[in-house]
Amino acid sequence: MSERNQRKVYVGRVVSDKMDKTITVLVETYKKHPLYGKRVKYSKKYKAHDEHNEAKVGDIVKIMETRPLSATKRFRLVEIVEKAVVL
């Protein structure tokens, strides 16, 4: 019924855009240590489909889970939340 709402959505930073129509997004999350209660930072890289090659390195983007598009690509670009500042 509303299966589309069950998909995972992450916000992360683009760390690579060297591939055609593919970006690598670094997603950082915090988890609480089970015994000591300290927040520990975890990070994971996801490859995402960028149809129009619009995301650049340093951009903050939102990605959504989708069907497998290649051997390693299971996410697609939803929107660019914040553009990187070019110096």
Curated annotation (Swiss-Prot):
Cellular component (GO) terms are:
cytosolic small ribosomal subunit
What single Pfam family name could you report for this chain, choosing any that match? Ribosomal_S17
Q: Which GO terms describe its molecular function?
A: rRNA binding; structural constituent of ribosome
Its keywords, alphabetically, are: Ribonucleoprotein, Ribosomal protein, RNA-binding, rRNA-binding
Kindly indicate whether the keyword Ribosomal protein belongs to this entry.
yes
An individual GO BP term: translation
Query: In which family does this protein belong, per the annotation?
Result: Belongs to the universal ribosomal protein uS17 family.
Q: Which HAMAP family match?
A: Ribosomal_uS17_B
**What does this gene product do?**
One of the primary rRNA binding proteins, it binds specifically to the 5'-end of 16S ribosomal RNA.
Official protein name in the record? Small ribosomal subunit protein uS17
What is the organism of origin for this protein? Geobacillus stearothermophilus
Per the record, the gene is rpsQ
